[in-house]
Amino acid sequence: MKREDFAILKERVHRRELVYLDNAATSQKPQAVIDAISEAYTHWNSNIHRGVHHLSQVATSKHEEARQKVADFIGAKSSDEIIFTKGTTDSLNALAFSFGEAFIGEGDEIIVSGLEHHSNIVPWQMLCERKKAVLRHIPLREDLSLDIEAFKGLLSARTKLVSVAHVSNVLGTIQPIEEIIRLAHAQGVPVGIDGAQSVPHMQVNVQALDCDFLAFSGHKMYGPTGIGVLYGKREWLEKLPPHEGGGEMINHVRWSGTTYNELPYKFEAGTPNFVGSYALSKAIDYIQALGWEAIEAHERELTEYCEAQLSAIEGVHIYAEHQPKAGVISFNIFTNHQSPITNHQSLLHPFDVGTLLDQQGVAVRTGHHCAEPLIDALGVPGTVRVSFGLYNDKADIDAFIAALKKAIMMLS
């Protein structure tokens, strides 16, 4: 993998070489993506659609070519099924509002899982409060996998939608999405997928999965911030009302009422992030040039290597250890000192561990990772999370492990 394409990896933090292991929060950008942003603002910046002048036509072409590239990247039938958003959170909020307006009434139920990021919980809670509906969640088994038997019991005639994460942003575990979709579809229930942590790390084909909706972000897959995607099957998108009003999403506006644009534009009110979509297309080019087989093998090797190194450290507890993961590991460190209050092993606070790692140039994420219900289920205030990208290597992990051992020694 080409570390030299990522200029930020040459930065020094606290006079040390940067070891960036926070890719689940955001990824770094290859030079091709950075250059694309500069190119757009330097050579063809102009508002898109309806412009007859050259710059507008160039910008429009770049934006729509990016839409087609995204459609091909995830295996969509048509670029009309690709809605550009600000990111995964924006995509899920749009889905919750539009689907809720069309299909959710009092007493109806929506199912999520016990692993979800707040972005796949709160929009549904807001919808349920507005519509007097009910939000249910798939419980976790003791090994932190989803209880599929319990999920079968949750499905009923009242279930209107299932929305689940493909990969846990805390545990990194890959969920049995195919089985969830099959079970839901057998009951006539559509399924939305939070792909924020899967699309950057594995090949996702929406037609092969047969999911009805998919949300993901550009910034986690080596693209820029402020651009994301909501995929939806055409037959569903045509039934949903717009979630925002304004320019571009209209067909005609009269005092007597408004008619809406065709797909996908009826969901894209206002000036779109055409620079972001173009830069995202360059991130897709970068990923495809390396190839999914090589990327997945590389990140799987890193994850297994890191998990083995962590397991060898006394006091380290890895959550969902040995389960298939997509480049994310969460852990905590428990000392042998007994707590006078609980009479249990003392937890080294994740924030303290993360701070000492940062002082040694190692960037990780600590806390509840915007997944408080899951962290509550773990019975801890948070975790230390390491997450990998295609530019990481074993030297990064070795540096992290050495820094972690030093941090443990200092805190113990």
What do these predicted ranges mean?
Residues 1-412:
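Pyridoxal 5′-phosphate
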